[in-house]
Amino acid sequence: MSIKNIIVIGGSGSIGSALSKELKKNNYEPILIARNEENLKKISNELNCKYFVGDVLKIDSIDKIIKNLGDNIHGLAYCVGSINLRPISLTKDEDYIESFKINTLGAINAIKLALPSLKKNKGSILLYSTVAVKQGFVNHTVISTAKGAVEGLTLSLAAELAPTIRVNCIAPSLTNSNMTNSIISNINLKKAIEVMHPIPKIGEGDDFSHIGAFLLSEKNKWMTGQILHIDGGRSTLRIKS
């Protein structure tokens, strides 16, 4: 059986690493890309998979990695994110530009580089958004603007690349990670956020890794252009406080 590579950009984070573990269970070969080599080594050793150090803000580094993989790319997951929460009155143009570069432009550039191989293999693309795009939260203009663009990218790409390549997006609620640790390390704040969800807890990467692995796999034959809200019900349900 031939090896089927899935590029996981942001593979050292909680979402990317959980997805990579699930892909490995399903006989796909995750190729991890991230900036933090220490974390990459740890996950790579655990999964016995390849990793490359790369920065989405330095597209040449991603270009070299993808060229190295040749035409054996069957999927691409862009698990990179950022968090910048503040009132709009305290934001600068640079906040929005940086967030767009990390969350949106980085995904666009990676997809463009991998596109020939993805087309050849009839592959799949998985992007990540946030519940804040649909729900609308205070102090979230920076991240919601960038991730809103990711959702638009998902729909446009799904239409453009059909029927050869499937493109979908997962939009979780607050998820436990190094990036969100400054929020959820505050026990009182964590509890207050948890009870806003009909299923009252903070998300974990493995709460939606199996769905991500399915979307990237050949088992997903008929799902494209979808934004999946895996958020404990926060985006759609209202419960008594």
Labelled PLM ranges:
Residues S124-A149, T154-A162, L174-T175:
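Catalytic loop of short-chain dehydrogenase/reductase
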Residues A171-S182:
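Short, flexible catalytic-loop segment of classical short-chain dehydrogenase/reductase
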Residues C169, N188-M223, I230-G232:
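C-terminal helical subdomain
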Residues S12-G13:
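Conserved glycine-rich cofactor-binding loop
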Residues P87-I88, D95-F100, K190-I193:
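Substrate-binding pocket helix/loop in short-chain dehydrogenase/reductase
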Residues P116, A158-P163, K221:
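Alpha-helical segment proximal to the catalytic Tyr-Lys
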Residues Q135, T224-S241:
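Short C-terminal tail/terminal secondary-structure segment
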